[in-house]
């Protein structure tokens, strides 16, 4: 793996914000990131080895060390040129420099002052996470504010480990949507029969099949909330997908200080 330090330009060099609507600026920033991720997704390979071991992964990292915040891309040697092209295509003013590994671990705190963890999804991966437009706030700014609380003796690393998702990931989303539509109105109990249906059958006269068939389409109408969920899943399936692991590691002089920094993140 090759560590690449990303030198970021002032925001005005890549995005001219003078006399422009904020929504247009947001769309431009998102489109730049989309260009980069589309190029990275093209590195996916096919074959037996890819199915067994998965795709090659890369890592984007935000590191706070020595009172400064740095951005890194750590990539396999064979993908260095591709990542350089992807970043240059999306952010022409950015520059990548090959550097040596950075050691963020405190010599004073050692193992006792080091703490870390990883983020996990609460629901299935078919559900989208809150995007930049939906959250109505700049998550990266909140993260930078947390990193800025680190002193020169502290070390913080936030790692986004990603690789292109397997080919059939979108089929899982389609199956989930189909299941929502088919199971609408079928909240059954034991044996596929609702308990209330059993009680009603004791005194309710039988109904013909035509009436049942006519009401089935009405039962399967999704509510506005369910339809919004379907739309969100379908929207996610339109874009290239990645398997992502987000990890955080913090090292400080004391365990208590590391805990405080972790809670800030």
Residue ranges and their predicted role:
Residues 1-265:
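Extended, folded cores of ATP/NTP-driven motor/assembly subunits in large transport
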